[in-house]
């Protein structure tokens, strides 16, 4: 397995990660024992990075990972994602970021991520969707940086839209994401 640093100042993680969408049941019925076996196999082969999200089985994926990691001693980094408030997906460039990611909602959502993953601090939290138009009004990222300073998040980022992955470059330059 090859390893690299996660983000600009992050810890070393495996270049191959475990994508946990399927273990949440979003792709159909999934036996929890099969999910645990898949996680065990990945970690046994050197994987140290797991990607999940609030929306993967309505938090089921996170809960499985949180319970599973209690039985392992490896240093594993978990990246999870918080969705915006209900509305058009992906968000329209004309919608207000403050309505889709208000501070109260972000804080409540982060508390649920912490509970599901059975941890006191999230390794990586991504906003689960983004639009380039929000680059000029990054209030949600500023809120996440404040929550990071409080110790509830170690690294902040965004899940970029497939059609506009370069929208993140400006945010990286401005230090709003890790």
Protein language model features and the residues they cover:
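Short acidic capping loops at alpha-helix termini that bridge into adjacent secondary structure
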Residues: 14-15, 73-76, 80, 120-124, ...
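Glycine/proline-rich, positively charged
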Residues: 89-178
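N-terminal binding-site loop/beta-alpha segment at the start of enzyme catalytic domains
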Residues: 1-77
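Hydrophobic positions in alpha-helices of CheY-like receiver
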Residues: 69, 82, 144-147
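Short glycine-rich, flexible loops that bind phosphorylated cofactors or substrates
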Residues: 25-26, 58-59, 87, 134, ...
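Glycine-rich, positively charged active-site loop/lid region within alpha/beta enzyme cores that binds
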Residues: 12-14, 22, 26, 88-95, ...
């Amino acid at each position: 397995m090859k390893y690299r640093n996660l983000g600009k100042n992050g810890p070393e993680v495996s270049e191959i990660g475990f994508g946990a969408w399927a273990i949440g049941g979003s792709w159909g019925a999934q036996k929890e024992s099969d999910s645990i076996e898949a996680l065990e196999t990945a970690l046994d082969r050197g994987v140290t990075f797991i990607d999940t999200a609030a929306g993967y089985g309505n938090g089921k994926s996170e809960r499985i990972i949180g319970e599973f990691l209690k039985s392992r001693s490896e240093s594993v980094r978990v990246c999870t994602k918080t969705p915006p408030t209900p509305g058009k997906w992906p968000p329209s460039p004309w919608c207000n970021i403050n309505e889709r990611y208000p501070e109260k909602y972000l804080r409540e959502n982060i508390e649920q991520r912490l509970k599901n993953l059975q941890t006191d601090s999230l390794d990586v939290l991504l906003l689960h969707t983004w639009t380039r138009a929000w680059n000029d009004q990054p209030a949600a990222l500023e809120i996440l940086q404040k929550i990071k300073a409080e110790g509830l998040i170690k690294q902040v980022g965004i899940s970029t839209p497939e059609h506009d992955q370069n929208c993140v470059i400006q945010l990286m330059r401005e230090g709003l994401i890790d």
